[in-house]
C-alpha cells in the first residue's frame, strides 16, 4: 500500500517527520519498506502560460513560443513538443533552474533563436517514467506560482507492507485511523455527500449466488461530458498511490478505492443487456479481460453477467466487452461485497493480480459499499457532469457478516504479555480503534467490533491490539511468574511407553506410517469394514483413513523385503478410524509383524523362519510384564489371516485383537515368498487396573507332574489349561507347559496326543503325595467329562 503523507494529513493532522512516522508505523505492525519523495529534486520551475506560437524558421520540429510568467515582459522559449499551443498552462524551468539528473537551465540559442528557459515534461521533472509532450496543467493553475507548491510536490510516499490480516489498512482512511490512535489525535472525518437522483433509470440486480456476493450496489449515470479530463490533483494522487490514469470515470473508481478501501468497477451501460446477474461461471465460457488476456471460465469463478454473457470476473478484473472507453456516455457503477473465500485463489489460479482482488480476498468492510458509491458519484458529477440515477442495492442478510460482539477479559492482557496496563488506558486504546465498549463489569468489557476490522474476533486479538498500540518497546524482559504443576501421565500413555520400550528391547523396529492408506490394500485386508474417504487426498494411493494398523506395517514390510532385508521385526502404535453408522470413532492400537529368518547366521544351529509361535510367545511375555493373567488365544478366522493359523486375543473376557499368519492369497498378491506373522491389539485392553502386590518367594518344594492323553484334534491346549487351572486348588499351579504334541502312526485320525507338565507348590507348607494324587485325579476326571480324553500310560 502506497500512502501520500500530505493526503494522509487531510485525515489526521500529525506533526511527525517522515522518519518518525515510518518508525512509528513499523513498530505498530505496519512495516514501512521505503519512504520516497514524490518528485525529483528541481528548483525554479513555475506555472506559465503559452501566449503565442509560431514555427521555427530553420527547424521543422521546433516551435517559437511567447510565455507569460506574470511579469512585465513574456519570455521567449524554443520548444520541441508537439502539444504546445496558445492558452496552455505549462511547467517552465527558468534560467538557473536545476532539474533531476543534474541538468541546469541557461539562456541559449537553438538554431539561431533565443530560448530563455525550458518547457518541461513530466518525465524531465521526475513525475513519471514515461510521458509524451510537455506537461499540461489546469487552466486554473496560478501563473507564476512555483510548481512544487502548486502540485504539493514536497511530499513523500510511504510504501507499507501489510500483513494478510490488516485488510483495513488498504486505504488512506485505514492508515489514518492507525496514525490517529497511535498519536491520540482525532480522525478528521471527510463528509460524504448523498447525491439525489436526477433520473429514474436503474438496472435489475439478481444475486443468484448470494452466499458469494451478499451485497451489491449499483448506479446509472447518463450523459457524461466526453471532453472531460481527470484533474491534475487526482492524477497526482493516483500516481502517488501507484496507479496510472486511464479515463475520468475509471480514475474516480481507483481514487475511491485508495481513499476508502472499497474496490469499484464501471461498466459501459450501452454494452449491458437488460440486467445484472451475479452468478458462477459456466464451464467453457470465455471472457476477454481488460488486460487483453482471454480466459476460459469454470463453475468456481464468480462472474458479473447480463442476460447473455459474462461482463467481469467478480472482484478481480472487468471484461473488455463492457469496458468504459473515450466515447462512453452512460455508465453503470458497481460497488459490492464479495465473500473473501470466493475470491481467494481464483486470481492466482488464472495468473491475475489486481488491486481489487488483493483487497477482496483479504476482506473489505461489508458496510462500506453504498458510501463508496455516493463518494464516486459526487466526484464523477463534479468532473464529467452527467445525471445520476437512484442507488440500487441488493443484499442477502443471511450471508452478510454480522456484528461481532463478545465479552473481553482485560486480565488476559497481563496474562499474555506481563504488562499491567490501567483499565482506562485500555479503554482509550480500544475506543481509538473504533471498538464500542457497551458495558464494563469488573475486569470485563462488553465490546462491539467496528465492521472494518474483520480481523478482530476474540480476546487474543484485542490483547494484540492493546499491546501494539501501547508499544512493544514497553515490553521488558522479566522472569516468568507462574505456578508449575507436574503433568499427569495417563494410563494409556504409560502403557504405550512400556509397550514401545518392551518391543524395542526384543529387537523390533518401531515404524511411524501415515494415517492415510492405499484403498486397494486396505480393502483387501478388511473387506467387511466401512472406510472414511478423504475429500482432498495427497494422492490416490493415500485416499482412505486407516481402519487398522496392518496396511501401514505391511507396506513397510514389503518395502524392506524388496531391498534384501532377510529379517523384518516391526511394531507400530497409532490411532485407527472406524466408521460406525456414519459416525467416525478413533481408537488406539498396537500392532506388529515378523517375517524372514530368526536370528543371525550361527555355526552351532541352522537358521529357521519366524512362525506363529514366535510372535505368540513374544505377546505372552508382554502380557506377563503387564501382569495380565486372564489372556486367551481362541482359534478363529479372519479374512486377512491363514484359516488354520489365526486366533482372537481375548483379555479379561473381552475381544482385544488378532494374531495369525497372513493369508496365502494375500502373500501371493503381495509377491511374498515367506510367511508373515502379525498381530493387532486395542491399546486400552492392555491397561491393568490391578495394583501388583508383593508376594514372597515360597520356601517350600515344587512338585512336577506330567500327563499324556489323547484328545479330539479340535481341542486346543488353552482349553485344556483353562480346565486344569479351574480344577487345581487355590494357587497351587505355578506353571503349565505343553511339551509334546503328536499326530500320526498309532494315533486315531481324529485324535492327537498331548503331553503337559504341571508344577505344583503351596506358599505356606509342603504338599504331600496324597494331596497331589487327589488333585491329579480331579484333573483327569474333569478332562474326561469336558473333552472325553483318554489317559495314556
Curated annotation (Swiss-Prot):
<dbReference type="Pfam" id="PF03484">
    <property type="entry name" value="B5"/>
</dbReference>
<dbReference type="GO" id="GO:0004826">
    <property type="term" value="F:phenylalanine-tRNA ligase activity"/>
</dbReference>
<keyword id="KW-0820">tRNA-binding</keyword>
<feature type="binding site">
    <location>
        <position position="464"/>
    </location>
    <ligand>
        <name>Mg(2+)</name>
    </ligand>
</feature>
<dbReference type="InterPro" id="IPR045864">
    <property type="entry name" value="aa-tRNA-synth_II/BPL/LPL"/>
</dbReference>
<dbReference type="InterPro" id="IPR005121">
    <property type="entry name" value="Fdx_antiC-bd"/>
</dbReference>
<dbReference type="GO" id="GO:0009328">
    <property type="term" value="C:phenylalanine-tRNA ligase complex"/>
</dbReference>
<dbReference type="Pfam" id="PF03147">
    <property type="entry name" value="FDX-ACB"/>
</dbReference>
<keyword id="KW-0547">Nucleotide-binding</keyword>
<keyword id="KW-0067">ATP-binding</keyword>
<keyword id="KW-0460">Magnesium</keyword>
<dbReference type="InterPro" id="IPR012340">
    <property type="entry name" value="NA-bd_OB-fold"/>
</dbReference>
<feature type="domain" description="tRNA-binding">
    <location>
        <begin position="39"/>
        <end position="148"/>
    </location>
</feature>
<keyword id="KW-0436">Ligase</keyword>
<dbReference type="GO" id="GO:0000049">
    <property type="term" value="F:tRNA binding"/>
</dbReference>
<dbReference type="Pfam" id="PF03483">
    <property type="entry name" value="B3_4"/>
</dbReference>
<keyword id="KW-0648">Protein biosynthesis</keyword>
<dbReference type="Pfam" id="PF17759">
    <property type="entry name" value="tRNA_synthFbeta"/>
</dbReference>
<dbReference type="InterPro" id="IPR009061">
    <property type="entry name" value="DNA-bd_dom_put_sf"/>
</dbReference>
<dbReference type="InterPro" id="IPR020825">
    <property type="entry name" value="Phe-tRNA_synthase-like_B3/B4"/>
</dbReference>
<dbReference type="GO" id="GO:0006432">
    <property type="term" value="P:phenylalanyl-tRNA aminoacylation"/>
</dbReference>
<feature type="binding site">
    <location>
        <position position="465"/>
    </location>
    <ligand>
        <name>Mg(2+)</name>
    </ligand>
</feature>
<dbReference type="GO" id="GO:0000287">
    <property type="term" value="F:magnesium ion binding"/>
</dbReference>
<dbReference type="InterPro" id="IPR036690">
    <property type="entry name" value="Fdx_antiC-bd_sf"/>
</dbReference>
<feature type="binding site">
    <location>
        <position position="455"/>
    </location>
    <ligand>
        <name>Mg(2+)</name>
    </ligand>
</feature>
<dbReference type="InterPro" id="IPR004532">
    <property type="entry name" value="Phe-tRNA-ligase_IIc_bsu_bact"/>
</dbReference>
<dbReference type="InterPro" id="IPR002547">
    <property type="entry name" value="tRNA-bd_dom"/>
</dbReference>
<keyword id="KW-0479">Metal-binding</keyword>
<dbReference type="GO" id="GO:0005524">
    <property type="term" value="F:ATP binding"/>
</dbReference>
<dbReference type="InterPro" id="IPR005147">
    <property type="entry name" value="tRNA_synthase_B5-dom"/>
</dbReference>
<dbReference type="InterPro" id="IPR005146">
    <property type="entry name" value="B3/B4_tRNA-bd"/>
</dbReference>
<keyword id="KW-0963">Cytoplasm</keyword>
<comment type="subunit">
    <text>Tetramer of two alpha and two beta subunits.</text>
</comment>
<keyword id="KW-0694">RNA-binding</keyword>
<feature type="binding site">
    <location>
        <position position="461"/>
    </location>
    <ligand>
        <name>Mg(2+)</name>
    </ligand>
</feature>
<feature type="domain" description="B5">
    <location>
        <begin position="401"/>
        <end position="477"/>
    </location>
</feature>
<dbReference type="Pfam" id="PF01588">
    <property type="entry name" value="tRNA_bind"/>
</dbReference>
<dbReference type="InterPro" id="IPR033714">
    <property type="entry name" value="tRNA_bind_bactPheRS"/>
</dbReference>
<protein>
    <recommendedName>
        <fullName>Phenylalanine--tRNA ligase beta subunit</fullName>
        <ecNumber>6.1.1.20</ecNumber>
    </recommendedName>
</protein>
<feature type="domain" description="FDX-ACB">
    <location>
        <begin position="698"/>
        <end position="792"/>
    </location>
</feature>
<dbReference type="InterPro" id="IPR041616">
    <property type="entry name" value="PheRS_beta_core"/>
</dbReference>
<comment type="similarity">
    <text>Belongs to the phenylalanyl-tRNA synthetase beta subunit family. Type 1 subfamily.</text>
</comment>
Amino acid at each position: 500500500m502506497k500512502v501520500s503523507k500530505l493526503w494522509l494529513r487531510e485525515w489526521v493532522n500529525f506533526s511527525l517527520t517522515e522518519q518518525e512516522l515510518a518508525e512509528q508505523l513499523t513498530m505498530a505492525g505496519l512495516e514501512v519498506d521505503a519512504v520516497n519523495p514524490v518528485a525529483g529534486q528541481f528548483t525554479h520551475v513555475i506555472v506559465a502560460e503559452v501566449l503565442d506560437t509560431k514555427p521555427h524558421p530553420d527547424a521543422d520540429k521546433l516551435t517559437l513560443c511567447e510565455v507569460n510568467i506574470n511579469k512585465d515582459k513574456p519570455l521567449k522559449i524554443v520548444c520541441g513538443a508537439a502539444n504546445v499551443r496558445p492558452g496552455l498552462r505549462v511547467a517552465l524551468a527558468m534560467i538557473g533552474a536545476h532539474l533531476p539528473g543534474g541538468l541546469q537551465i541557461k539562456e541559449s540559442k537553438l538554431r539561431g533563436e533565443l530560448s530563455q528557459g525550458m518547457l518541461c515534461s513530466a518525465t524531465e521533472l521526475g513525475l513519471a517514467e514515461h510521458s509524451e509532450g510537455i506537461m499540461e496543467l489546469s487552466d486554473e493553475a496560478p501563473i507564476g506560482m512555483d510548481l512544487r507548491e502548486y502540485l504539493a510536490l514536497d511530499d513523500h510516499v510511504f510504501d507499507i507492507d501489510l500483513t494478510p490480516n490488516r485488510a483495513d489498512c488498504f486505504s488512506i482512511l485505514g492508515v489514518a485511523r492507525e496514525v490517529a490512535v497511535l498519536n491520540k489525535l482525532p480522525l478528521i472525518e471527510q463528509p460524504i455527500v448523498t447525491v439525489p437522483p436526477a433520473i429514474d433509470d436503474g438496472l435489475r440486480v439478481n444475486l443468484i449466488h448470494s452466499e458469494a456476493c451478499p451485497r451489491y450496489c449499483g448506479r446509472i449515470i447518463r450523459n457524461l461530458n466526453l471532453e472531460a479530463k481527470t484533474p491534475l490533483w487526482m492524477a497526482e494522487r493516483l500516481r502517488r498511490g501507484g496507479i496510472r490514469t486511464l479515463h475520468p470515470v475509471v480514475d474516480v473508481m481507483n481514487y475511491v478505492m485508495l481513499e476508502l478501501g472499497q474496490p469499484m468497477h464501471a461498466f459501459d451501460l450501452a454494452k449491458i443487456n437488460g440486467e445484472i446477474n451475479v452468478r458462477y461461471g459456466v464451464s467453457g465460457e470465455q471472457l476477454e479481460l481488460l488486460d487483453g488476456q482471454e480466459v476460459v471460465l469454470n463453475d468456481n469463478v464468480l462472474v458479473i453477467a447480463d442476460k447473455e454473457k459474462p461482463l467481469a470476473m467478480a472482484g478481480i478484473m472487468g471484461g473488455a466487452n463492457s469496458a468504459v472507453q473515450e466515447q462512453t456516455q452512460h455508465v453503470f457503477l458497481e460497488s459490492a461485497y464479495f465473500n473473501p473465500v470466493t475470491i481467494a485463489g481464483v486470481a492466482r489460479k488464472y495468473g491475475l493480480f489486481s488491486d481489487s482482488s488483493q483487497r477482496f480476498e483479504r476482506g473489505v468492510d461489508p458496510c462500506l459499499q453504498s458510501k463508496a458509491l455516493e463518494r464516486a458519484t459526487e466526484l464523477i458529477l463534479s468532473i464529467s457532469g452527467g445525471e445520476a440515477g437512484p442507488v440500487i442495492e441488493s443484499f442477502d442478510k443471511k450471508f452478510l457478516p454480522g456484528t461481532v460482539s463478545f465479552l473481553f477479559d482485560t486480565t488476559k492482557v497481563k496474562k499474555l504479555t506481563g504488562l499491567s496496563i490501567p483499565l482506562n488506558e485500555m479503554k482509550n486504546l480500544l475506543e481509538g480503534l473504533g471498538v464500542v465498549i457497551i458495558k464494563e463489569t469488573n475486569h470485563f468489557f462488553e465490546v462491539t467490533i467496528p465492521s472494518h476490522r474483520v480481523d478482530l474476533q476474540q480476546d487474543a486479538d484485542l490483547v494484540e491490539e492493546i499491546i501494539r498500540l501501547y508499544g512493544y518497546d514497553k515490553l521488558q524482559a522479566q522472569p516468568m511468574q507462574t505456578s508449575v504443576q507436574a503433568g499427569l501421565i495417563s494410563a494409556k500413555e504409560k502403557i504405550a511407553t512400556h509397550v514401545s520400550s518392551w518391543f524395542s528391547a526384543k529387537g523390533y523396529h518401531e515404524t511411524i506410517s501415515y494415517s492415510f492408506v492405499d484403498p486397494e490394500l486396505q480393502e483387501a485386508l478388511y473387506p467387511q469394514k466401512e472406510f472414511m474417504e478423504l475429500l482432498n487426498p495427497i494422492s490416490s494411493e493415500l485416499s482412505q483413513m486407516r481402519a487398522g494398523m496392518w496396511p501401514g506395517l505391511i507396506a513397510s514390510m514389503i518395502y524392506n523385503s524388496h531391498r534384501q532385508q532377510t529379517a523384518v521385526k516391526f511394531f507400530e502404535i497409532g490411532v485407527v478410524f472406524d466408521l460406525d453408522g456414519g459416525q467416525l470413532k478413533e481408537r488406539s492400537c498396537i500392532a506388529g509383524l515378523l517375517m524372514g529368518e530368526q536370528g543371525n547366521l550361527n555355526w552351532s544351529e541352522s537358521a529357521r523362519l519366524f512362525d506363529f509361535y514366535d510372535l505368540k510367545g513374544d505377546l505372552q511375555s508382554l502380557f506377563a510384564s503387564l501382569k495380565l493373567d486372564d489372556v486367551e488365544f481362541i482359534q478363529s478366522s479372519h479374512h486377512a489371516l491363514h484359516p488354520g493359523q489365526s486366533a482372537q486375543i481375548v483379555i479379561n473376557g473381552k475381544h482385544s485383537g488378532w494374531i495369525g499368519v497372513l493369508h496365502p492369497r494375500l502373500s501371493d498378491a503381495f509377491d511374498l515368498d515367506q510367511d508373515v506373522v502379525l498381530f493387532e491389539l486395542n491399546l486400552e485392553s492392555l491397561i491393568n487396573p490391578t495394583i501388583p502386590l508383593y508376594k514372597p518367594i515360597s520356601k517350600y518344594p515344587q512338585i512336577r507332574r506330567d500327563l499324556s492323553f489323547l484328545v479330539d484334534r479340535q481341542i486346543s491346549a488353552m482349553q485344556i489349561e483353562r480346565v486344569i487351572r479351574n480344577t487345581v486348588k487355590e494357587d497351587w499351579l505355578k506353571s503349565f507347559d505343553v511339551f509334546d504334541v503328536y499326530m500320526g502312526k498309532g494315533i486315531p485320525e481324529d485324535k492327537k496326543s498331548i503331553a503337559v507338565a504341571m508344577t505344583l507348590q503351596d506358599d505356606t507348607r509342603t504338599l504331600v503325595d496324597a494331596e497331589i494324587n487327589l488333585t491329579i485325579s480331579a484333573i483327569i476326571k474333569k478332562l474326561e467329562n469336558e473333552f472325553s480324553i483318554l489317559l495314556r500310560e
